[in-house]
Amino acid sequence: MSLHGIHTIDTAFQRDHFDAAYLIVEDGRGAFVDCGTNHSVPLLLAAVQQAGITSADIDLLIVTHVHLDHAGGAGLLMQQLPNATLVAHPRAAPHLIDPEKLIAGATAVYGEEEMQRSYGTLLPVPEARVRVVEDGETVMLAGRALECIDTPGHARHHHCIWDARSRSWFTGDTF
């Protein structure tokens, strides 16, 4: 079920109904907002199929921020989305292109075993497939405007997404 072409996907991070990603479908084209962890990727791909489109129809993966419960699966998911561009905050993009600091930091906090259990192996996203967006910049999905607004409260690399068509905010971890 969707409203305004927005499908909510439970990423199954840690427990049910704790973390979500979104699939926006407009005129047969798709965009994800956030992606969860590597373990979430099969759920996201199933949502694409349930929405009646294919992974080749996904044009955008927009991450609100690089914390691993929201963007840890970006590298793996992008491998499955041949036509997608990853959209990221200027402070987030370098960590998605080269996740070594994310890996080191999370491993230091959680340990190797928990890191693997919760997030899996983080993969880089090729720089050529990453689009950095500044505050107020708009990305388009089949004519649907998605505006990226810098919201550094939760993390300095966080932005929220305003979808004018549905009059909805995608807030990541910002209230």
Describe each PLM feature range.
Residues L96-I149:
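Metallo-beta-lactamase
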Residues F13, T37, L68, G153, ...:
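Short, glycine/acidic-enriched loop or turn micro-motifs at the edges of active sites
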Residues V87-H95, P99:
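A short, structured active-site edge motif that brings together acidic residues
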Residues L23-V25, G136-D163:
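Core dinuclear metal-dependent hydrolase active-site scaffold
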Residues M1-A51, S55, I161-T171:
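Conserved beta-strand hairpin/beta-sheet module of binuclear metal-dependent hydrolase folds
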Residues P42-A88:
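Active-site metal-binding motif and surrounding structural segment of the metallo-beta-lactamase
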Residues V33-G36, I58-H65, V87-H89, T151-G153, ...:
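Active-site neighborhood of phospho(di)ester-bond hydrolases with catalytic His/Asp-centered motifs
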Residues H39, L68-D69, P94, K101:
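Short alpha-helical
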